[in-house]
């Protein structure tokens, strides 16, 4: 499974968020001020570690999440850009991921929700972070909703 690390290729505010999350072992960084991205307050975030599809290196990104039936749900919005985020491309190539939610760390298998499940999860996630709706309006691609199914021993 991929390991967590501070990303080098992302903006400084994301690097700082991940560094705080990791250095505090999840005691800080879990709640994030979403106003920087158009939100209206603090939102819970997780860290997702994927394996780079070309490099094979671990890649870590913080993401807003929701919980449904013991699984975690994230949105591959990339702010509504025309391309999917790299982390999503990575997990479609290798769905085995590592997840940190506050102080809880676990392995999971990522899958893209489809059909009715996607619609229900999209509604839940856009209720948590309403800017997702604006992101969807500004792109021609359907923004993926990803379910992180924890691996049980």
Which stretches of residues belong to each language-model region?
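Short beta-strand micro-motifs in enzyme catalytic cores
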Residues: 46, 144-146
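Extreme N-terminal tail/first-helix region
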Residues: 1-38
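Extracellular/periplasmic catalytic domains that process cell-envelope and extracellular macromolecules
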Residues: 39, 66-67, 138-139
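Short, structured beta-strand-loop surface elements
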Residues: 4-8, 77-132, 138-142, 150-152
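Short beta-strand segments
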Residues: 42-79
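Short coil/turn segments at secondary-structure boundaries
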Residues: 33-36, 136-140
């Amino acid at each position: 499974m991929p390991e967590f690390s501070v990303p080098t290729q992302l903006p400084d505010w994301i690097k700082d968020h991940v560094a705080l999350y990791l250095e505090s072992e999840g005691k800080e960084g879990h709640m994030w001020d979403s106003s920087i991205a158009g939100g209206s307050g603090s939102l819970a975030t997780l860290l997702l570690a994927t394996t780079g599809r070309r490099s094979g290196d671990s890649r870590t990104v913080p993401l807003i999440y929701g919980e449904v039936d013991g699984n975690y749900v994230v949105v591959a919005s990339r702010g509504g850009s025309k391309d999917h985020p790299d982390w999503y491309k990575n997990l479609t190539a290798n769905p085995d991921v590592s997840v940190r939610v506050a102080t809880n760390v676990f392995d999971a298998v990522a899958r893209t929700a489809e059909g009715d499940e996607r619609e229900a999860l999209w509604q839940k996630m856009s209720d948590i972070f309403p800017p997702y709706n604006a992101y969807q309006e500004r792109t021609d691609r359907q923004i993926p909703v990803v379910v992180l199914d924890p691996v049980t021993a």
